[in-house]
């Protein structure tokens, strides 16, 4: 093992004789190693490292403060030992690489304050301020790279899912005059919804699918509705691709999918909430169950049927 820092081991508390107190003098120990037990974590270092800076550790190991030792000679410090190795590195080198996460920096700063290491406290405070000033994205939107990835994302999500598929390369014909604008409006609405419902709904993008512009809505791992925004129309005796922007329909399905935020709500209750009011006529219990299942099936078929039912050319 090279350097002054240490071996780190976690000890289990054991019943034994009470620790005894003793005093250290720099002249008596010099560069000899001392053994430290910091909250159950064991460290080896030298008195020279511990006394380089004017800190509480220097007071402990220069004879100004008494220290506790156990029967095996370990010097006991009643603090968490998680960041003590980092503190030793700072005492030896006057600089360290701070942790990446804010919580760990706060923990390290608390220990530095306890040991009165002002230089390390200043480093931690500056790092926390820098992280505070950094821009953090409001939400992250996955982009699908394969059908398996899409399936895995939807099945594992505890939130409702809204997916927008847009892929201009799927078009075989020319676009109608407003199609480009409508495609852009669909994308802009997706971005607005992802910001508005961030944290409540998982929004994903698909740029490799077989459609040109299509919205899909999922709850509890199941597909609930689909809004396809493209159709083929005839203009001047040739086929063209028409992209629409059914804004109201998209909002409606997005609000419907929010009913699936709580996974423990019974499925029948959710399905009934998104369907039309039930008939007032009296039926047997079996007939009611069959009617509900049939109505749900037809609702899904209706939701999926977003194309114009008229024949092409009419």
Swiss-Prot record:
GO terms for molecular function: small GTPase binding. The keyword Nucleus applies. Residues 32-100 form the BTB domain. GO terms for cellular component: Cul3-RING ubiquitin ligase complex; cytoplasm; endosome; nucleus. Keywords: Cytoplasm, Endosome, Nucleus, Ubl conjugation pathway. GO terms for biological process: cell migration; immune response; negative regulation of Rho protein signal transduction; proteasome-mediated ubiquitin-dependent protein catabolic process; protein homooligomerization; protein ubiquitination; stress fiber assembly. Pathway: Protein modification; protein ubiquitination. SMART domains: BTB. The keyword Cytoplasm applies. It is found in: Cytoplasm; Nucleus; Endosome. Component of the BCR(TNFAIP1) E3 ubiquitin ligase complex, at least composed of CUL3, TNFAIP1/BACURD2 and RBX1. Substrate-specific adapter of a BCR (BTB-CUL3-RBX1) E3 ubiquitin-protein ligase complex involved in regulation of cytoskeleton structure. The BCR(TNFAIP1) E3 ubiquitin ligase complex mediates the ubiquitination of target proteins, leading to their degradation by the proteasome. This is BTB/POZ domain-containing adapter for CUL3-mediated RhoA degradation protein 2. It comes from Gallus gallus (Chicken).
């Amino acid at each position: 093992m090279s350097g002054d820092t240490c071996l780190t081991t976690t000890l289990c508390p054991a019943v034994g004789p009470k620790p005894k107190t003793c005093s250290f003098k720099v002249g008596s120990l010099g560069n000899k190693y001392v053994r430290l037990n910091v909250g159950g974590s064991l460290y080896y270092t030298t008195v020279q490292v511990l006394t380089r800076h004017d800190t509480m550790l220097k007071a402990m190991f220069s004879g100004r403060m008494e220290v506790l030792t156990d029967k095996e000679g370990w010097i006991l410090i009643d603090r968490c030992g998680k960041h003590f190795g980092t503190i030793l590195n700072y005492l030896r080198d006057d600089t360290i690489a701070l942790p990446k996460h804010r919580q760990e920096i706060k923990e390290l700063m608390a220990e530095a304050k306890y040991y009165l290491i002002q230089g390390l406290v200043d480093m931690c405070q500056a790092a926390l301020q820098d992280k505070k000033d950094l821009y953090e994205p409001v939400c992250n939107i996955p982009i699908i790279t394969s059908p398996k990835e899409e399936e895995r994302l939807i099945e594992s999500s505890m939130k409702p899912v809204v997916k927008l598929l847009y892929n201009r390369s799927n078009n075989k014909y020319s676009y109608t005059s407003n199609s480009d604008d409508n495609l852009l409006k669909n994308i802009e609405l997706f971005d607005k919804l992802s910001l508005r419902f961030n944290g409540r709904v998982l929004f994903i993008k698909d740029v490799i699918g077989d459609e040109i512009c299509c919205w899909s809505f999922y709850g509890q791992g199941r597909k609930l509705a689909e809004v396809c925004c493209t159709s083929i129309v005839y203009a001047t005796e040739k086929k063209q691709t028409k992209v629409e922007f059914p804004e109201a329909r998209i909002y409606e399905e997005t609000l419907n999918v929010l009913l699936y935020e709580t996974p423990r709500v019974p499925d029948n209750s959710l399905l009934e909430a998104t369907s039309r009011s039930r008939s007032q006529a009296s039926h047997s219990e079996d007939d009611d169950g069959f009617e509900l299942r049939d109505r749900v099936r037809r609702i899904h078929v209706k939701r999926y049927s977003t194309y114009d039912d008229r024949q092409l050319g009419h």
